[in-house]
Amino acid sequence: MPESLMNIRVDRKAFAGNTVLQDIDLSLQSGEIVSLLGPSGCGKSTLLRIVAGLEQDFRGSVDNIEGEVAFVFQEPRLMPWLTVEQNIGFSDDAGYDRRWVGQLIEEVGLSGFADALPKALSGGMAQRVAIARGLYSHPTVLLLDEPFSAVDAFTRMKLQDLLLQLAERHAITLLLVTHDVDEALYLSDRVLVMGSRPGTITQQLPVGLQAPRDRRDPLLARLKAQALTELHQAHII
């Protein structure tokens, strides 16, 4: 059994008196990839913000965090006046490590773009910068909020494969929010299905695909059918 890295419990999270999350009990294991799958408004992004420490007003706890936690948002949120290199090292008040930034630029496939401004980048390239920025602090856990929803299908597949490579290379744990059943199954070791009103985890689906993953694997089709059945049973679709 992998080492438990983080325990997340949300008894209740409310906005303006309305309960948006309830009875969440989740543990993350070292090195695993977990997806939160569910409809809009079920509290997936709110749960991610709680794990990141961006939401403090809730009843519950986030325990046993070891090391840094980094966040990759749905939009890259790059500083338009900073270069790719500067955007990646932006959070380092002491002055960023140019060698480390250069390595990350190479790892995310942007060699030759260190001095480029965001306006010169495609959407997929900008999101590669955002992922590199998330990795800059050597996080133990990387949180991703629908990171590939704004790119085309072919770019999305390339970015998914890149994410798997980076997770393995850096031995990090990923917690990912997505609306895409195929993406959740392809990337994850576990898929957690969330229902809404209030948001809670209704189903847990172990994936069990071996690396390297193959989109043509018949197991993916069987898992998708199972996931869709569970989404129907939870009245999510």
From Swiss-Prot:
Q: Which InterPro entries match?
A: AAA+_ATPase, ABC_transporter-like_ATP-bd, ABC_transporter-like_CS, ABC_transporter_ATP-bind, P-loop_NTPase
> What is the annotated localization of this protein?
Cell inner membrane
What does the UniProt keyword field contain? ATP-binding, Cell inner membrane, Cell membrane, Membrane, Nucleotide-binding, Translocase, Transport
Residues that bind ATP, according to the entry? 38-45
Q: Name one GO molecular function term.
A: ATP binding
Recorded catalytic reaction(s): these are:
ATP + H2O + aliphatic sulfonate-[sulfonate-binding protein]Side 1 = ADP + phosphate + aliphatic sulfonateSide 2 + [sulfonate-binding protein]Side 1
Residue ranges of every copy of the ABC transporter domain listed in the record: 5-221
**Does Nucleotide-binding show up as a keyword for this record?**
yes
State the membrane topology: Peripheral membrane protein
Q: Which family does it belong to?
A: Belongs to the ABC transporter superfamily. Aliphatic sulfonates importer (TC 3.A.1.17.2) family.
Tell me, in a sentence or two, what this protein's role is.
Part of the ABC transporter complex SsuABC involved in aliphatic sulfonates import. Responsible for energy coupling to the transport system.
* Subunit field text: The complex is composed of two ATP-binding proteins (SsuB), two transmembrane proteins (SsuC) and a solute-binding protein (SsuA).
Q: What is this protein called?
A: Aliphatic sulfonates import ATP-binding protein SsuB 1
Task: Provide the organism lineage as a comma list.
Answer: Bacteria, Pseudomonadati, Pseudomonadota, Gammaproteobacteria, Pseudomonadales
Gene name of the encoded protein: ssuB1
